[in-house]
């Protein structure tokens, strides 16, 4: 298996730290808002990486954190006049709603920054004791020039970084590129006691401490988006390797951006679509299929037409699966097998090998999906030759085709499985949720029109009627939100 390692700037053979065991840390969201489609890409892709390792028989330790202490959370909480940790917990719960819809498996561990302050303080103390950190007025900074290899992940020198960075000049720092490990407490912000006074962690130290706790040093794969290469992952390497005198992570994987009109999708640019907005228009399986339809290191430009095309492509798989299930229900008789049965069995073996070859080449999901289409085509051809009955041998081959489709799906995670029958659910439950979302949004629009006309009785009647049906409306400064009661 070959993985493109950002650190080496090349594909390298994957050799796990521990035989038969893969350790992965993927940077999770800063929980101050619902996730957008750009956040969903690494979520779905690294879930697929994990699934493929499991398919190959590895034991996988998968850690994905939540940054629940951050400037963005504090600012958003101030706007909404609630406690920052309460706001963060709210959006952690909302994250799981979206992740579950996209059929993303829960990580083995989902650590939160607020629950790992002790580990963070311990790591900062080690850096201070070794001369890599210094204290100024209750703030603690990492001295980047104390780590000789700073810049090895991004491939840039400190001078180049400083010239191109938008760094606020702080005369208290020894170097403009030094970054905060600990921030002194400010009124209204979450804070914890520390050897340097009350305060809270900086962003970068959080992942270093949590990755070390759950995976140890020299773990296998650290993942995230391209935008995390610098400064976040560069700083993680500096902190962890300066403190431990050992490699931090061995393979660094970064996915490309989702773009709109060739511009990165991001909350800061305001050109983003929330996952739940997309799921109001398209079924979850189609959205996941779309996210895997392009190689993970390539940019993925967003528009509705691409999702429509993804839906049509996925329907080809579902059509083959429907036909296969019909054939598997045919009665069995004793007789001669249809011509070409042996060739079909060989074709199944070939397609499996091609699929694995694609995934072994830096997780090329786009190519792997093309072999899924080949499989659907071959299933259609074989099933089309069947009559009203099948032999035991033919039934065995149909079962092999079903197993192969399930194995491909086990890796790509597109369709959910009926635990009782073992069959894949061709129509996902999320399709009903999509209809519900659309209907509720339509009703909200009608209510808003009534409110704009000062027709308060109609607006109240709509709100009360929805509440009786288990749908609660919340009027917020950002607009009307709804949720299912209970």
From Swiss-Prot:
Reaction(s) catalysed by this chain's protein: tRNA(Cys) + L-cysteine + ATP = L-cysteinyl-tRNA(Cys) + AMP + diphosphate
UniProt GO BP: cysteinyl-tRNA aminoacylation
EC main group: ligase
UniProt short sequence motif 'HIGH' region, positions renumbered to this chain: 29-39
Sequence motif 'KMSKS' region, location on chain: 264-268
Keywords attached to this entry: Aminoacyl-tRNA synthetase, ATP-binding, Cytoplasm, Ligase, Metal-binding, Nucleotide-binding, Protein biosynthesis, Zinc
A single Gene Ontology CC term: cytosol
Any one GO molecular function term: ATP binding
Similarity field: Belongs to the class-I aminoacyl-tRNA synthetase family.
NCBIfam families to which the protein is assigned, alphabetical: cysS
Self-association state and partner proteins as the record states: Monomer.
Protein's name in the database: Cysteine--tRNA ligase
Lineage, top ranks: Bacteria, Bacillati, Bacillota, Clostridia, Eubacteriales
The gene coding this protein: cysS
């Amino acid at each position: 298996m070959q993985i493109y390692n950002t650190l080496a700037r090349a594909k390298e053979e994957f050799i796990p730290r521990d035989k038969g065991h893969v350790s992965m840390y993927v940077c999770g969201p800063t929980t101050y808002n619902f996730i957008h489609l750009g956040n969903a890409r690494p979520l779905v892709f690294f879930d697929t990486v994990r699934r493929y390792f499991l398919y190959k028989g590895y034991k996988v330790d998968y850690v994905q954190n939540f940054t629940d202490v951050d400037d963005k959370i504090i600012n958003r909480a101030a706007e909404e006049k609630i406690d920052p940790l309460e706001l963060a917990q709210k959006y952690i719960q909302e994250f799981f709603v979206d992740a579950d819809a996209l059929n993303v498996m829960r990580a083995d561990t989902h650590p939160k920054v607020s629950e790992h302050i002790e580990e963070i303080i311990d790591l900062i103390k080690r850096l201070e004791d070794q001369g890599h950190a210094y204290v100024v007025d209750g703030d603690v900074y990492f001295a980047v020039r104390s780590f000789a290899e700073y810049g090895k992940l991004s491939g840039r020198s400190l001078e180049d970084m400083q010239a191109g960075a938008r760094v606020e000049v702080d005369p208290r720092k020894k170097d403009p590129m030094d970054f905060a490990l600990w921030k002194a407490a400010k009124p209204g912000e979450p804070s914890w006691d520390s050897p340097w006074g009350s305060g809270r962690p900086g962003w970068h130290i959080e992942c270093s401490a949590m990755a070390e706790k759950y995976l140890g040093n020299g773990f296998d794969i650290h993942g995230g988006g391209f935008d995390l290469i610098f400064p976040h992952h560069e700083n993680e390497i500096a902190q962890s390797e300066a403190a431990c005198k050992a490699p931090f992570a061995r393979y660094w994987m970064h996915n490309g951006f989702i773009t709109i009109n060739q511009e990165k999708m991001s909350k800061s640019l305001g050109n983003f679509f929330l996952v739940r907005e997309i799921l109001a228009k398209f079924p979850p399986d189609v959205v996941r299929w779309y996210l895997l339809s392009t190689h993970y290191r390539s940019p993925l430009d967003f528009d509705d037409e691409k999702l429509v095309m993804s839906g049509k492509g996925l329907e080809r798989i579902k059509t083959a699966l429907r036909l296969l299930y019909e054939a598997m229900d045919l009665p069995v008789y004793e007789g001669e097998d249809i011509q070409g049965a042996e060739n079909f069995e060989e074709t199944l073996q070939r397609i499996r090998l091609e699929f694995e070859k694609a995934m072994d080449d830096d997780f090329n999901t786009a190519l792997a999906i093309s072999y899924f289409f080949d499989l659907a085509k071959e299933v259609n051809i074989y099933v089309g030759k069947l009559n009203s009955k099948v032999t035991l041998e033919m039934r065995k081959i149909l079962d092999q085709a079903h197993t192969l489709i399930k194995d491909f799906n086990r890796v790509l995670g597109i369709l959910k499985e009926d635990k009782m029958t073992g069959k894949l659910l061709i129509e996902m439950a999320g399709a009903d949720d999509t209809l519900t979302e659309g209907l509720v949004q339509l009703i909200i629009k009608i209510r808003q029109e009534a409110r704009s006309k000062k027709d308060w009785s109609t607006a109240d009647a709509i709100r009360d009627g929805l509440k009786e049906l288990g749908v609660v409306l919340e009027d917020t400064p950002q607009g009307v939100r709804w949720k299912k009661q209970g």
